[in-house]
Amino acid sequence: MITDEAFRQAVKAAIAEHKKDRNIAFTWEGQTYWIKRRLSNGRNQFAKSSVNVQFYTEIARSSIAHTLTGLSPEIVYLDADCMVTRAAGENINHWMRRRDVSEEEKLEILIRTGQALGELHQAGMTHGRPALRDFLYEDGRVTLLDWENMPRWDNKKKRMTMDYLLLLLLLFREPYSEIDYIKALEKGYTGVNGGETRKWARAFLKKHALIGHLAKALDVFHMKDVEAFSRLYRYLAD
């Protein structure tokens, strides 16, 4: 933890300058940091306690993930209203959309992304909503953000399966998605955690085949989320 009073004042100044923002970047002594404030993300306003629950859940789960795997950024400053971490690069979508990044580099980034999720699962943890925007990449290192989601199921196998399916689904949703990219993501994961989770994911989709067939039938309407699920179903279950 950073206990320097000058750092605390820099945090307060950044918040004062961006009063309405939940996530704030600022620079101190040449290093970029991110402040995450105890504010609503706008998605769960109906739940009165959700702001506090999300904030304290994130502190706890992020700290555990950092201790077990190093995949979560270290919390360097903490008070009752915010947490601060060091910046850890740009998210995966940023790298995949850059034209100056080679195909080989993009494949390697996705392999590392899959490895990161596999390492997390190997450590006995799951993420809950592994969106591509929550995976940061810098100099070969992947960092995971947004740990505010409480696990929905006690069954670890089910949680791992949902993590796996969600990550693939969100990649299928992107305009840049290609089968080589999907396979790179899977290669990274299975290289660390084996192929069991993929088998569970395939079995889960087959169990809900009606939804998969419905999504395929709706392809003609070009609805982004439905098309992404249809592609996922065709890839894993057909």
Residue ranges of predicted features:
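ATP-binding glycine-rich loop module of kinase domains
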Residues: 12-56
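Conserved kinase catalytic-core helix
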Residues: 58-71, 96-133, 138, 142
